[in-house]
């Protein structure tokens, strides 16, 4: 289901599993995804509590392996541990993919950390193909 603005605080803990900003920052990030026409938040509930969340958006800059623009992009998916391996993440990603199709996208992409083998396995299992591996650098000026 498409999450609503009023759900942002309740989703903060779930998003905090994958992103390590402060709870206040996470709530604002979630709200910004909900407020934009270029992004969406989908969530799943069980027994009255949120057990899964997926955030997606449109990327108009270069996306590894993609030839079109915009590209639908899975920004993050998080499932409570007790509910993993039940198809919930797959369902949420499918909702993101449908949203991207409705936005005119013909490609859908994502990423994960090089060391996150569980995420890599999940992506491959639901039909993504690995396009590239990179290491990012920075230095102060």
Which residue ranges define each predicted feature?
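A short beta-loop-alpha structural element at the N-terminal edge
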Residues: 1-11
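Active-site rim helix/loop that mediates acceptor-substrate recognition in acyltransferases
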Residues: 21-45, 55
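Conserved beta-strand in the GNAT
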Residues: 43, 49-58, 73, 78
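Conserved acyl-donor/pantetheine-binding loop and adjacent beta-alpha core of acyl/acetyltransferases
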Residues: 45, 61-71
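Conserved acetyl-CoA binding element of GNAT-fold acetyltransferases
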Residues: 67-81, 135-136
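Conserved acetyl-CoA-binding loop-helix of GNAT-fold acetyltransferases
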Residues: 79, 85-98, 121-125
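Conserved active-site alpha-helix within GNAT-family acetyltransferase domains
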Residues: 90, 102, 114-133
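Conserved GNAT acetyl-CoA-binding A-motif
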Residues: 93, 100-112
